[in-house]
Amino acid sequence: NFVKAAEKVGFRADVVSRLSQEELGHYDALFIRETTAIDHHTYRLARAAEREGIVVMDDTQSILRCCNKVYLQDAFAYQKVPAPKATFVSSATDEVCEKLIADFGLPLVLKLPESSFSRGVHKAENKEALKARLEQMLAESALVLVQEYIFTEFDWRIGVLGGKPIYACQYFMVRNHWQIYNHQGDRFSSGGFATMPTFEVPKPVLQAAIKAAKAVGDGLYGVDIKQTGNAVYVIEVNDNPSIDSGVEDKYLGKELYELIMQEFADRLEQRGR
């Protein structure tokens, strides 16, 4: 789909699964469609592309910021992005647990600073579970993000490109599970979805998505938002959001891919390629 869209806006696109730094120099633009991480070849490739002056999405700044919940939390507070009440903890004493419960109530959501796609994310229903889970998580990370729990039937996922919303989905929770992804054991399941035009999305949801994306950069992001009544809460900003045939493209179809490829064309033009 992306290859056809690239042709339509006037350039040839190759799908590559591996790319050496020499080969990278033959291209004008790089679009990473693999889950990114900091200590990972995707980040190294993005950095190499930037050094070569190649237009790249996701850029290294976006990868660093999206993979870092400490940064996102601070940026949201500073830019006044509506988000769930949250704090970072570095110990799991009774005192810490009691204060968390007093401040945020129960259940609580616990996240590793570098978690994504519902992995490394846990829910604690009571003090014992909170203490046990915190101890376990602090064994692998110096900090754990603790958030108030907000129940909703679905999460909004707003795709934002260059500061503008381009697609909107509702991802529903997995049956009998509190997240949109369930990684129980070896089985992986995800809930249902609904895709709609961005003009049908409530205004506060779109505004929050644009504001949250701006705190990260001007690339392509998937912003996850919960809405209860008139209140909206940004849960996180994902670089490299999934764009699956029949899901995110269900409303716009081919146009979604063309919009993204056009962004590359525009950026190349700005650089005089």
Task: Please give the residue ranges for each predicted region.
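Glycine-rich phosphate-binding loop of ATP-grasp-fold ATP-dependent ligases
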Residues: 72, 84-86, 108-133, 155
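Conserved N-proximal alpha/beta basic substrate-recognition cap immediately N-terminal to
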Residues: 1-85
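Phosphate-binding site of ATP-dependent enzymes
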Residues: 122-216
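ATP-grasp fold ATP-binding core
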Residues: 76-77, 101-119, 141-156
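Protein kinase-like catalytic core scaffold
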Residues: 108, 165-167, 221, 233-236
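Rossmann-like NAD(P)H-binding beta-loop-alpha module
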Residues: 84-107
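C-terminal active-site "lid" helix and adjoining low-complexity regulatory extension at the edge
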Residues: 3, 200, 214-215, 227-273
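A short glycine-rich, hydrophobically flanked beta-strand micro-motif that places a catalytic Asp/Glu
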Residues: 15-18, 147, 218-229
